[in-house]
């Protein structure tokens, strides 16, 4: 995935500077448990919003830095740098026949996202309990290390 590759790039020191944006991350293990609980405990025709924990790229870099014992993120750039990356993202996709790493839609999503996804119903009815995002990041680092993708 594009995010998986960015994760690897950060861990390998290829993204020393970042724009300080983030997302609400849900560990797939927690999502699967909640999906099973939905089948068993969920109410018919009820929708459940399942959130995790918000963390930005600087926070991800800090967790990885502790895990890998090296400083990964050296600084942040202003948000407008994301817009400046659009032409190079397009050209890289064109020349290397890979998906674009940034689009105007992905930038819009980051700008207008809700950083707090409460998941109240999922927690109350489906026993949704998102694990700490640090645990997810550390487990993901180990996963990629075992495959030789993080050195």
Predicted stretch roles:
Residues 114-118, 122, 127-132:
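Internal helix-turn-beta structural module
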Residues 22-23, 99-104:
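Short coil/turn segments at secondary-structure boundaries
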Residues 1-24:
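NAD(P)-dependent short-chain dehydrogenase/reductase
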Residues 19-22, 48, 110, 124:
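Conserved short-loop catalytic and cofactor-binding motifs
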Residues 57, 102-118:
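Active-site loop of classical SDR/Rossmann-like NAD(P)-dependent oxidoreductases
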Residues 20-23, 28, 32-36, 40:
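C-terminal helical subdomain
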Residues 34-101, 124-125, 132-151:
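Mid/C-terminal beta-alpha module of Rossmann-like enzyme folds, strongest
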